[in-house]
Structure formats: structure tokens, C-alpha cells
């Protein structure tokens, strides 16, 4: 993966696919509107302001350009200057390094911001579903201003884009790590050995990672935020071996879901990890994340994929026939610890959300289980 040229003190190194232009004016009407009422994702005092400034190249704006959002300054991110606020970007301090990955709604790059490693996500103008792209951008900002060891933090965000840019907005995030839990589970490291011959995650490591994720969920739920796309690919592992929940493009705030029983909002996500009530189009609750965690814990334990077959058949069977991944393997049946782990997983993916544990209860059970291992 090629790196860009080094950055100067006053410029942004951009990937090759960005075309340089001599002068681009951002029209006053070019600020991306929220597809939903502003109070759903941002307090009204943090709503986008209009400020038509020029920029010399895509993703670069003058150093003293006006803030895109108005409001008080949240606590600063560790390692970054005290004056920084999440609702504005100091573009002169951004230096892109290389692309980390891309998906349906945009691309993620490794970069530095004020000399600190960060990840930068650009949300594209998805021609097939522009509204979905907009929702993804605003949903990512549900966690703006929040800080927790097991959540990837939003450092800064901007809706500012040049006229010819394909980006709806830019989000600068804490760099959570180069490795995802998915890569660790399935050993996606280009090892020549077949998966069946490779070392499995130890039970202790599974519990450590599980507690990291549940701690993150407990914090999110305490802030009335649902992730709604929890899976190993959306869990980063830092250099300090700490799991951090990332990718909040499907997240929702609980207050936005209340009172909408007749017309639940569209919820994205991954069908293999979606709770039955979500597949049925019902209103989401924190228990939907607990279900997704149960599937994730099963993956950590077995290193297998949850289902095979056509997605529509799997979704129907999950709802109609209570289909779940198999718990018949030796890892669950050969020991008392395996049986205890089986019970935890089974409780997480109960058909009815009310029967699943809360994140708080799950945290307590996992800690107690870890204590029995000595």
C-alpha cells in the first residue's frame, strides 16, 4: 500500500485519486444538511453553520476558517492541543498517509492530526442511496464528544467539501489499531497454515476481549446509544491489546427511537448479527447489541462463521425457527468452563430481548466467570 509524499507544515498530502485544482469555492448552500431533524443527532446549538470560504485543493481549507458547528468545546483528546474541538478541523494539521480500507459509504485513511496518529473517514456521495450515505455520516457523530477506553473516539468532523469532491463529509477519529477482531479470530495474516492447524484464541483472551467489548457497550447504553452493527470486523485491537468498538454508521439514539412504533426508522447492519426483532422491523433496544455480542463471542470461541446459505433464508430461519449457530462443539461440551461459556452465549441470543441480559449483568457474569479460572 503506497504512502503519500510527506506533508509540509501547511498542506495536506492527498491520495493519487484526488485531483488537484487551482481554486475551488465552497458554495454557501454546499454544507450537507442532516437528512433528519437536527435534534436527532446533534443538539441544536451544534447544528451546521453556513460559511462560504474558498479552499485551494480538495479537503484543504484555510487555517482560520470559521467553525462548522457552533457550541461549547468538549474535553480535548489526549495527546492533542487543548484548543481542539470535535466540531471543527484544522486542515493544515492533517497529513494523510495511506488508505486503510473502503466500504459502501466511503474510505478510511491512516493519517496524523497535529502530529498524532488518527484515522480519517470520508463518507462518499453514494449515487445509489444518497440518503443512506447522509445517515451514515450523521450516525457516526452520535459518539462525538464522548470518551471511553473501549470506544473509538471522534476527534473532529466537518461537512465542508469542495464542489467537485465526492465526499459528503470528513470524520477524524482516534487511531484504534491496525488489526480487527475479525482478523484475529480468522487469522487473516496470510499464514500458509490452514485455519484448522493454527492456534486458537485462549479462553482467557476470549474473556479479556469480551469484557472490553461489553465495557464499551455498557458505556454506550448508559449514554442511550445503540451501536446496531456490532461484529468482529467493527472491533479494533490497539497496540496495547485493548478492544475498541468502531464504525457507528448504523448507530441510533434511544430518544430518537421512542414514539416511533408505527414507523420504525431504517436500520442497517449485518444480517448474521442482527437480532430477530430487528429482522422483523421492530424498534431497536439495547438488547439488540447484546444479541450481536452473543454471535461475536461464539465466533471468538469457535473461529467459525455463523451461517452458510442464502441471506434471506438465514434471516427467515432466525426469526421463524430460532436458528442459531451450533453450540454442539467440543469446546462447549467437553468441560464445565465450556458449558458455562455456552450458557452465557445462549442467554445473549435468546429470541426475546427481555430474556437477554443487560450489558451491566453481562459484565458481572463475565467477571465472575473469569474469576473461576484463577
Curated annotation (Swiss-Prot):
Hydrolase listed as a keyword = no
Q: Say yes or no: keyword Transferase present.
A: yes
Which residues does the Swiss-Prot or TrEMBL record annotate as the active site? 229
Sorted alphabetically, the keyword list is: ATP-binding, Kinase, Nucleotide-binding, Oncogene, Serine/threonine-protein kinase, Transferase
- The record's EC number reads 2.7.11.1
Listed under catalytic activity are: L-seryl-[protein] + ATP = O-phospho-L-seryl-[protein] + ADP + H(+); L-threonyl-[protein] + ATP = O-phospho-L-threonyl-[protein] + ADP + H(+)
An example of a GO molecular function for this protein is: ATP binding
Q: Where is the Protein kinase domain?
A: 94-370
Q: What class of enzyme is it?
A: transferase
The record's InterPro entries line, in alphabetical order, gives: Kinase-like_dom_sf, Prot_kinase_dom, Protein_kinase_ATP_BS, Ser/Thr_kinase_AS, Ser/Thr_Kinases-Pseudokinases
What residues does ATP bind to? Answer: 100-108, 121
Q: Which family does it belong to?
A: Belongs to the protein kinase superfamily. Ser/Thr protein kinase family.
**Name the record gives this protein:** Serine/threonine-protein kinase-transforming protein mos
Query: Source species, please?
Result: Moloney murine sarcoma virus
Q: Which gene is annotated as encoding this protein in its UniProt record?
A: V-MOS
Amino acid at each position: 500500500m503506497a504512502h503519500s509524499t510527506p506533508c509540509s507544515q501547511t498542506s495536506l498530502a492527498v491520495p493519487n485519486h484526488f485531483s488537484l485544482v487551482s481554486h475551488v469555492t465552497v458554495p454557501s448552500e454546499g454544507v450537507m444538511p442532516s437528512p433528519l431533524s437536527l435534534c436527532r443527532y446533534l443538539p441544536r446549538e451544534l447544528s451546521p453553520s453556513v460559511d462560504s470560504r474558498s479552499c485551494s485543493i480538495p479537503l484543504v481549507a484555510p487555517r482560520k476558517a470559521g467553525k462548522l458547528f457552533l457550541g461549547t468545546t468538549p474535553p480535548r483528546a489526549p495527546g492533542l492541543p487543548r484548543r481542539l474541538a470535535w466540531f471543527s478541523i484544522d486542515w493544515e494539521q492533517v497529513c494523510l498517509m495511506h488508505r486503510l480500507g473502503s466500504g459502501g459509504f466511503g474510505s478510511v485513511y491512516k493519517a496524523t492530526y497535529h502530529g498524532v496518529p488518527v484515522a480519517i473517514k470520508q463518507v462518499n456521495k453514494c449515487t445509489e442511496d444518497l440518503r443512506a450515505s447522509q445517515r451514515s455520516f450523521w450516525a457516526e457523530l452520535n459518539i462525538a464528544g464522548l470518551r471511553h477506553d473501549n470506544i473509538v473516539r471522534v476527534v473532529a468532523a466537518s461537512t465542508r467539501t469542495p464542489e467537485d469532491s465526492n465526499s459528503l463529509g470528513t470524520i477524524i477519529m482516534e487511531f484504534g489499531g491496525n488489526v480487527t477482531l475479525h482478523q484475529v479470530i480468522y487469522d487473516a495474516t496470510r499464514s500458509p497454515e490452514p485455519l484448522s492447524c493454527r492456534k486458537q484464541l485462549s479462553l482467557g483472551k476470549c474473556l479479556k476481549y469480551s469484557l472490553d467489548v461489553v465495557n464499551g457497550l455498557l458505556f454506550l447504553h448508559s449514554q442511550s446509544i445503540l451501536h446496531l452493527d456490532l461484529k468482529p470486523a467493527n472491533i479494533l485491537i490497539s497496540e496495547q491489546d485493548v478492544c475498541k468498538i468502531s464504525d457507528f454508521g448504523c448507530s441510533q439514539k434511544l430518544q430518537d427511537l421512542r414514539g416511533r412504533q408505527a414507523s420504525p426508522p431504517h436500520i442497517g447492519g449485518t444480517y448474521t448479527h442482527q437480532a430477530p426483532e430487528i429482522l422483523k422491523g421492530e424498534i431497536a433496544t439495547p438488547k439488540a447489541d447484546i444479541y450481536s455480542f452473543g454471535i461475536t463471542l461464539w465466533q471468538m470461541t469457535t473461529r467459525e462463521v455463523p451461517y452458510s446459505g442464502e441471506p434471506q433464508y438465514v434471516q427467515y430461519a432466525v426469526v421463524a425457527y430460532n436458528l442459531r449457530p451450533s453450540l454442539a462443539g467440543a469446546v462447549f461440551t467437553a468441560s464445565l468452563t465450556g458449558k458455562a461459556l455456552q450458557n452465557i452465549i445462549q442467554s445473549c441470543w435468546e429470541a426475546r430481548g427481555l430474556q437477554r441480559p443487560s450489558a451491566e449483568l453481562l459484565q458481572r457474569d463475565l467477571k465472575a466467570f473469569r474469576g473461576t479460572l484463577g
